[in-house]
């Protein structure tokens, strides 16, 4: 999972104005970096120009995803990432950056601003922090921990069962479980199996 670009733009009529941008092109060869950066700027402007105000979208181009968020006040943000990067985290980042940007930069500067004139320094920090979505986004971190717990629990149950043994057989042979508990287990098992897609 990788973030390549984080941009803040103003959706003018008809052109989008780049206000500030941060790039991570370290994964590209030295001779490609400036061209890749220019292409990302061009793509970001084009996507904002073609998106409506108050909209969010994800545009796929080969193995890259461009996430765009254009607010109703014409302030827009674009994240360019690989296709594995979670879109929910990308939109969380865009919302956070645009809120922060709108508080630090006067609205009258948006239509006439440029990367040289806009005084906002948060993009590089956000780009590096959000490279690992699990660390940057609490929900992703919790989801990853839940997935790991599921794997551990699944492996633990399998390791408790001996070769060829099934949990169903153990439940039916059990002397500790009462008939009501066995009936509950069988009912739960049937309900879970009827809903499985085969």
UniProtKB/Swiss-Prot annotation:
Keyword Lyase: no
Main location: cytoplasm
Annotated InterPro entries: Longin-like_dom_sf, Longin_dom, R-SNARE_YKT6, V_SNARE_CC
Lipidation (S-farnesyl cysteine): 195
EC number per UniProt: 2.3.1.-
Residues bearing the modification Phosphoserine: 159
CDD domains (alphabetical): Longin, R-SNARE_YKT6
Domain notes for this protein: The longin domain regulates palmitoylation and membrane targeting.
Protein name, UniProt field: Synaptobrevin homolog YKT6
């Amino acid at each position: 999972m990788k973030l390549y670009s984080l941009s803040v733009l103003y959706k003018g009529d008809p052109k989008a104005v780049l206000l500030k941008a941060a790039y991570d092109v370290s994964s590209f060869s030295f001779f490609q970096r400036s061209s890749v950066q220019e292409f990302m700027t061009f793509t970001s402007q084009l996507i904002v120009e073609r998106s409506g105000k108050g909209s969010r979208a994800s545009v796929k181009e080969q193995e890259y995803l461009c996430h765009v968020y254009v607010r109703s006040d014409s302030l827009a943000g674009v994240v360019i990432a690989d296709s594995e990067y979670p879109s929910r985290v990308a939109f969380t980042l865009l919302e956070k950056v645009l809120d922060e940007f709108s508080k630090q930069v006067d609205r009258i500067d948006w239509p006439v601003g440029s990367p040289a004139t806009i005084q906002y320094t948060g993009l590089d920090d956000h780009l590096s922090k959000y490279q690992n979505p699990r660390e940057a986004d609490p929900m992703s971190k919790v989801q990853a921990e839940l997935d790991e717990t599921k794997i551990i629990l699944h492996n633990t149950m399998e390791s408790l069962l001996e070769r060829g043994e099934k949990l169903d057989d153990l439940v039916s042979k059990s002397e500790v479980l009462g008939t009501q508990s066995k009936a509950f287990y069988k009912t739960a098992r049937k309900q879970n199996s009827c809903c499985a897609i085969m």
